[in-house]
Amino acid sequence: MKISIITSTYNSEKTVKDTLDSILNQTYKDIELLIIDGKSKDNTLEIVRRYEKMFQGKLRYISEPDKGIYDAMNKGIGMATGDVVGILNSDDLYMDNKVLEDIANAFNQNNVDAIYGNLIFVEEHDTNKVVRTWKGSQYYPESFLNGWHPAHPTFYVRREVYEKYGVFDISFNVSADFELMLRFIEKHRISNLYMDRTLIRMRMGGESTGSIGKIITGNKNVLRAFEKNGFKVSVFYPVKRLLPKAIDMIKNKLKFKK
């Protein structure tokens, strides 16, 4: 079973080497890496080209202007030839070198369309320093309406699901990943499995862990995502969504306090 990994880059010279090493060191080798660059102005492409031979024909890249990270992801999905598609951002890392092997085994042993798991948030300049954790759980009907959703960087899905139900709606900006997972899992009820295993180390300060403004915009778009997909949510939904995250952040701050 081939896994297609999509990595979007834009001026990512400070972090992309770590990401490439993380992929290169995986024990599972039936992969392809698709790097979708947004016309970087730094040394990102030079770094990618240095790694090209190391991937022995399994790395392909393009560099052209895009309409943002989700547009880049859509380009990658269009290029993918694997059975399963996953996304690893250019500032993120796999938790260890057996992540893809475990994901492949889970797909092979379970007749499911999608798999997701846990992630840890780490310091931008020290990826061994944990800031907080995101522990997932198994989906059940209407979970999304109660504030649940998978951590998107851990979300691996069969390519045929994208072909059947579509790709990222780039009008949703910072929460297009939420809308896509809502559409796939809650609306179309694709089969899915939660792996109780940490899959990703996600740097703080990235596209979806940044400013308060992005968080506010993201939550507005989440409500629009429900409307687009024909769901009515309770007026208490924002509380259901944000309160557990706030509690989790406080717990993690105490847990990982210096």
Where are these regions (language model features)?
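Membrane-proximal basic amphipathic "stem/tether" segments
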Residues: 227-258
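Nucleotide-sugar donor-binding/catalytic module of glycosyltransferases
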Residues: 1-214, 254
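Catalytic core of nucleotide-sugar-dependent glycosyltransferases
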Residues: 197, 202, 210-236
